[in-house]
Amino acid sequence: MDPVIALVGRPNVGKSTLFNQLTRSRDALVADHPGLTRDRQYGVGKVGERPYIVVDTGGLGDDPEGVEQGMHQQALAAIEEADAILFLVDGRSGPTAADEELAAHLRRQGKPVWLVVNKTDGVDHRLATAEFHALGLGEPLPIAAAHGRGIAGLMDHVLAGLPEGFTSAHAALQVEEAEGATRIAIVGRPNVGKSTLVNRLLGEERVLVYDMPGTTRDSVFIPLERDGRPYTLIDTAGMRRRARVHETVEKFSVIQTLKAMEAAHVVILVIDAREGVTDQDTHLIGHVLESGRALVLAINKWDGLTAEQREAVKAGLERKLTFLNFARRHFISALHGSGVGLLFGAVDKALEAARRDLPTPILNEILADAVAAHAPPLVQGRRIKLRYAHQGGKNPPVIVIHGNQVKKLPGAYKRYLEHVFRDELDLYGTPVRLEFRSGENPYEGRRNKLTPRQQRRRKRLMRMVKR
């Protein structure tokens, strides 16, 4: 799996700036429940072809009386679940008592730690890092996060020190699970019924292996079989004993969710019907869309709602999830089992759509019909031309469209084409990505050369104009 890198340090040393440089995002996932994450940011970055997950732990306190008292418990949890730690210090202020306490705490963790000296722009790097050798965390690495200097070299250095073996657990899982098994990640906010749903699915089917260690620290991979087809459920909340299925709060980790989506073929996103779609739900949906995984929506706790309440919930879903019209919605009760059995069929259809072969002749026919029904707009008096299309990838399906001036194609027209391809090909349950490529004009910048006959005709016309 992707390595998890935690950014640790005192307040105002530049952790958030470095986070934004590494991920080019400010996305924060907030859990509205006491004791859960409130101030951490999560993002995904990539160096070359190697992705990684970054956690910004926020300020860890400036109290020299003791690190344990100054640290937030959630920041400690982030350090605990990280595979590597970037310890940021301020190169302008030099090491402080709090830095020394933090360094001592990190040394006890037994994890790879890189000492990163930020704010070294405009100063001699050797002088800026000299005092930090006393922290006992190896060679300090100077950067200037605000200007992006030294960050590429830093990440090359960090990832070189992390073995590719982070993917070995996933590979081992593929050996253990049944051949061709569909991996389903059950994700959602705390207390929406994820574990109840997992246990309901397992209670209805024959469990081949009940408890298999997963690739994430608390997620569990559970193979099962239904109608002769193998599946693997990924429970991001961790497997519970049956006596504890009714816990009031499920364990919640963004890291688990991101890793589960990476390992899965299809994601079942569980939403609490009684609370509707929250901001945290939309953040999770954003992560699913970014991952490109096929998606099924499970609207849980449907039982007990009156007819009016159900209509209100459906109206809210239509209003807030207009961008998610490709995902099938299933109204279920994980506690009582109503509607749960239909989820497997929805998963199969979504995965089939995500993996489908899209013949080029059919794509070109659909493109031609779409352009004939609604032509692209004019740009500076010239019509944007879409020439041909072909498949560029699967899971999610990628359709590559070639033409001229495609960079100027409006977003509304791109969405129109996406809807046309989805409807015509029945690609529901999976995101569809369109890529537009402009063909180079070999005659650009060249003037047509006139033939001798054309030159004589031009001279005659010029003489007539002069008269």
Curated annotation (Swiss-Prot):
This is GTPase Der. The keyword Nucleotide-binding applies. Residues 448-467 have a biased composition (Basic residues). The gene is der. One of its GO terms (molecular function) is GTP binding. PROSITE patterns: G_ENGA (PS51712). Associates with the 50S ribosomal subunit. Residues 356-440 form the KH-like domain. It comes from the Bacteria. Residues 439-467 are annotated as: Disordered. It holds the Pfam family MMR_HSR1. Belongs to the TRAFAC class TrmE-Era-EngA-EngB-Septin-like GTPase superfamily. EngA (Der) GTPase family. GO terms for biological process: ribosome biogenesis. GTPase that plays an essential role in the late steps of ribosome biogenesis. Keywords: GTP-binding, Nucleotide-binding, Repeat, Ribosome biogenesis. GTP 2 binds at residues 188-195, 235-239, 300-303. PANTHER family: GTPASE DER. GTP 1 binds at residues 9-16, 56-60, 118-121. InterPro entries: G_ENGA, GTP-bd, GTPase_Der, KH_dom-like, KH_dom-like_a/b, P-loop_NTPase, Small_GTP-bd.
